[in-house]
Curated annotation (Swiss-Prot):
Top-level EC class as recorded in UniProt: transferase
Listed Pfam families: PFK
Catalytic activity: beta-D-fructose 6-phosphate + diphosphate = beta-D-fructose 1,6-bisphosphate + phosphate + H(+)
InterPro entries documented for this protein: ATP_PFK, ATP_PFK_prok-type, Phosphofructokinase_dom, Phosphofructokinase_III, PKF_sf
GO cellular component terms given for this protein: 6-phosphofructokinase complex
Function field: Catalyzes the phosphorylation of D-fructose 6-phosphate, the first committing step of glycolysis. Uses inorganic phosphate (PPi) as phosphoryl donor instead of ATP like common ATP-dependent phosphofructokinases (ATP-PFKs), which renders the reaction reversible, and can thus function both in glycolysis and gluconeogenesis. Consistently, PPi-PFK can replace the enzymes of both the forward (ATP-PFK) and reverse (fructose-bisphosphatase (FBPase)) reactions.
Lineage, uppermost ranks: Archaea, Thermoproteota, Thermoprotei, Thermoproteales, Thermoproteaceae
TM stretches of this protein: none
Chief place where the protein resides: cytoplasm
UniProt keyword annotation of Aminoacyl-tRNA synthetase present: no
Marked site (Important for catalytic activity) residue numbers: 123
The protein's name: Pyrophosphate--fructose 6-phosphate 1-phosphotransferase
Binding site for Mg(2+): 101
Length: 337
C-alpha cells in the first residue's frame, strides 16, 4: 500500500516522534509518504516518499519536520475535487492524519466520501480533542507553562506585585487548570467556568495582603476578540491577560503585570510522557492500518489505547468537567460570575 502521513493545525511537542514511529513500522511492508504542510500538501502535491532514516535526526525535537498548515481541503467543492484527483494521481491508499478537531474532521470527510481511507491521531496542546484523555503535546506544554510561571512568580515576590499569566486554550481550560493547580495560583480563569472579575480582584487582593504578592492564571479563550479568522472559522485569540491585569490594578490599586506565554510553550522538546504517548499512538495507528480498521482515531482511555470512530469525535470539544471541574471548584469556589 501507499500510505501518506500528515500533521495539521498548530504544532505540538511529540509530532516528530509520532511520524517517525509510524514510518519506522510501516516502511517494513509499505511505501510511506510525507505529506508536507498538512492537507495543503495534498492540494499542492507536496508529497515525498520518506524513510525512518530521513526523520531520525528530528524525532525528538519540538515542532513538525513535515510542516503543517490550517488548510481546509473541503472548504468548497472545487478543493474537494482537486483533493480527490490528486489522491488518485498519487496513488495513495491511506492517510494517517495527526491533528486536532479540524484535521481529524477532514480525515473523516475524506473517508466518508471514499477519497481515501483514514486513521487519526489526536494532537493539540489544548487537550480538547473529544474521545481521548490526552493528546500529543499537552503534557509538554503544561510543563513549559509551569516552569515559566514559577520563574515569573519569583519576580512577583521580589517586586511585591500581582501577576497574570495568560496561557493557550480556546474552548477548554486544561492548560490553565493544570498550570494553576501545579503553581497554587490564587485564581484561575477557564472558558468553562465564567468568573466575575470583581471576585478575582477581591481574591487576589486578599492574597496580596497576606504575603505581598499574588498570582492569576487565565486561559486565552475566556474572551474572544474580533478580527481575522482562519479557514475553519476560528477567531484569533489573545490579549485577555493584559486586560485582566489592568482591571485588577484599577480595582485594587496594586501594581499588576501580565505575561503571555503563547507559542513559546508549544515549541519545547517533548516530555517523557508525550514521547511515550506518541509512540503508543503511532503504533496503534499502524496496527489499525494493518488490520484494515479505518475511519477511526486512536485514543487514550484510563491508561489504555483504544479506537474511536472519527465521526463520533469531530465537532465536539473535551472540556473541563466532572472530576476536574469539582477539583477546580474546590480550590477556587469564590470566583463565580
Amino acid at each position: 500500500m501507499k500510505i501518506g502521513v500528515l500533521t495539521g493545525g498548530g504544532d505540538a511537542p511529540g509530532l516528530n516522534i509520532a511520524v517517525y514511529t509510524f514510518v519506522k513500522l510501516a516502511e517494513r511492508k509499505h511505501e510511506v509518504y510525507a505529506i508536507y504542510h498538512g492537507w495543503r500538501g495534498l492540494l499542492n502535491k507536496e508529497v515525498k516518499r520518506v524513510s525512518s532514516r530521513d526523520l531520525l535526526d528530528f524525532a525528538f525535537s519540538g515542532g513538525t519536520y513535515i510542516r503543517t498548515s490550517r488548510t481546509n481541503p473541503f472548504k468548497d467543492e472545487e478543493r474537494a475535487r482537486l483533493l480527490e484527483s490528486n489522491v488518485k494521481e498519487l496513488g495513495l491508499d491511506v492517510v494517517v492524519a495527526i491533528g486536532g478537531d479540524d484535521t481529524l474532521g477532514a480525515a473523516g470527510e475524506a473517508q466518508r466520501r471514499g477519497i481515501l481511507d483514514a486513521v487519526g491521531i489526536p494532537k493539540t496542546i489544548d487537550n480538547d480533542v473529544y474521545g481521548t484523555d490526552y493528546t500529543i503535546g499537552f503534557d509538554s506544554a503544561v510543563n513549559a507553562a509551569i516552569e515559566a510561571t514559577e520563574s515569573f512568580k519569583t519576580t512577583l515576590i521580589s517586586h511585591e506585585r500581582i501577576g497574570v499569566v495568560e496561557v493557550m486554550g480556546r474552548e477548554a481550560g486544561w492548560i490553565a487548570l493544570f498550570t494553576g493547580l501545579s503553581t497554587m495560583a490564587d485564581a484561575v480563569l477557564i472558558p468553562e467556568r465564567p468568573a466575575s472579575w470583581d471576585s478575582v480582584a477581591k481574591r487576589v487582593k486578599e492574597a496580596y495582603n497576606e504575603r505581598r504578592w499574588a498570582l492569576v492564571v487565565v486561559s486565552e479563550g475566556i474572551k474572544e476578540y474580533g478580527g481575522p479568522k482562519d479557514e475553519y472559522g476560528h477567531s484569533r485569540l489573545g490579549g485577555v491577560g493584559n486586560e485582566l491585569a489592568e482591571y485588577i490594578e484599577r480595582s485594587t490599586g496594586i501594581e499588576a503585570r501580565a505575561v503571555v506565554l503563547g507559542h513559546t510553550i508549544r515549541g519545547v522538546p517533548p516530555t517523557a510522557f508525550d514521547r511515550i504517548l506518541a509512540v503508543r499512538y503511532a503504533t496503534a495507528a499502524y496496527e489499525a492500518v494493518e488490520n484494515g480498521r479505518y475511519g477511526v482515531m486512536v485514543a487514550y482511555s484510563n491508561g489504555d489505547i483504544a479506537y474511536v470512530p472519527i465521526v463520533d469525535v469531530v465537532g465536539k470539544n473535551r472540556l473541563v468537567s466532572g472530576y476536574w471541574m469539582r477539583l477546580y471548584e474546590t480550590y477556587w469556589p469564590d470566583l463565580a460570575g
